From Swiss-Prot:
The record marks S363 as: Required for activity. The lineage of its organism: Bacteria, Pseudomonadati, Thermodesulfobacteriota, Desulfuromonadia, Geobacterales. Its EC number is 7.1.2.2. GO terms for biological process: proton motive force-driven ATP synthesis. It catalyses: ATP + H2O + 4 H(+)(in) = ADP + phosphate + 5 H(+)(out). This is ATP synthase subunit alpha. Coiled coil: none annotated. Its main location: membrane. One of its GO terms (cellular component) is proton-transporting ATP synthase complex. Pfam families: ATP-synt_ab, ATP-synt_ab_C, ATP-synt_ab_N. PROSITE patterns: ATPASE_ALPHA_BETA (PS00152). It comes from Geobacter sulfurreducens (strain ATCC 51573 / DSM 12127 / PCA). InterPro entries: ATP_synth_asu-like_sf, ATP_synth_asu_C, ATP_synth_asu_C_sf, ATP_synth_F1_a_nt-bd_dom, ATP_synth_F1_asu, ATPase_a/bsu_AS, ATPase_F1/V1/A1_a/bsu_N, ATPase_F1/V1/A1_a/bsu_N_sf.
Amino acid sequence: MEIRAEEISEIIRKQIKEYGKEVEVAETGTIISVGDGIARIHGLDKAMAGELLEFPGGVSGMVLNLEEDNVGAAILGEDNENIKEGTTVKRTGRIVEVPVGEALIGRVVNAIGQPIDGKGPINTTTFGKVEVKAPGIVKRKSVHQPMQTGLKAIDSMVPIGRGQRELIIGDRQTGKTAVAIDTIINQKGGDLICIYVAIGQKRSTVAQVVSKLQEYGAMDYTIVVSASASEPAPLQFIAPYTGVTMGEYFRDNGKHALIIYDDLSKQAVAYRQLSLLLRRPPGREAYPGDVFYLHSRLLERAAKLSDDCGAGSLTALPIIETQAGDVSAYIPTNVISITDGQIYLESDLFYSGVRPAINVGLSVSRVGGSAQVKAMKQVAGTLRLNLAQYREMAAFAQFGSDLDKATQMQLARGERLVEILKQPQYRPIPNEKQVLVIFAANNGFVDEYPVSSLRRYESELYSFFDSRKADILAELRDKKAIDDDLKAKMIAALEELKKEFTA
């Protein structure tokens, strides 16, 4: 084979022409200790707080502590054999981001937005920063649109508005998750996108919730973020921020979203674990000093935006689990002071058959009243007072049997109101039907029936109005208020039902 000098020189010239001078510069550090989801890294002098790090084996990490001679980072994933002392960690120069957008709807993802439902990758090119500043005062608008839960006791006495933060608090096994799931199911056919964040729960429980949501067609507008009990503390800590980042995408694009954190006590425990491993000084109940900020910066991101900012909203329903009804513990008092009200669920009520087990005296909605539908405001105005008086009288009535007629009537009415406000799980009720049944109870239409027949009366009332008085339901739905004319129609219809219903 003949070697041609001109050919060789041509190839060399071409190579020189195409030679790229780019040099890849990476800032790296060395792991000096690792364990329990925490790595200490030497050599990352320019790392930022909250920065994303690249660990060996494709695992990510997040910078939490910036110290004089090392950096403390949380490993966002399972500790694997590739992450050990002496291995190299790279800086990315980016803050932790998660995928956001419409493509996530109907999916179940982990704490960093990766799909775990076996339905393939999520096709989205949009990412959102996990840590961002909450909207300022100028960007906000006061809460004025209702967010219906479909639960009579809540929509009538503890109304929630779009953009509000309403805490659901109670002991374990009092129906906190049930209230949240019913609220999601009630949004079917509406314009709310729901995000359910499961923190520190059993995988079987999360699977059960997802199957219930699928059964009622609610996964069509729901995203589930799961950081189960078996996952490392850093993932349980970051999951709520991942969820709120996904919700903010809809809020900032003029849409309406609802996010449920189930539950924040477990997130606080995970954060306590992280902080103690990072050797941060412990405070009350061994929680770090910034545990209030942990929840306040999360919940402040739920807001109703002003018209100039697109008028979107993000409503938050955080859940907190109490120990033996102790609402004055550290985390419960923190979250109560951050939120715009709380729904307090009581185990005594739950076991006595009052479900949802809402304690009306301790539950309050600080801003929801201005968002409540006017018709509901008209019928439920005295409901809370009547129930509070009934509870007080019932306590005294235990001591004496000879009660006057007025007291007996008030006790009978109260008993019926409590019965009417009971509701089975997974059966949210539209607002106009709630108004009707509370109107009937308030105006004495159920006084003569025994308490045991009220559940049947309620279902017959709904079917009677659905089949024969649909115009009244439509008028209630459209007007959202009760005028004299509509009131007369409602009374006439209820009188007609009274003749037909036999207890």
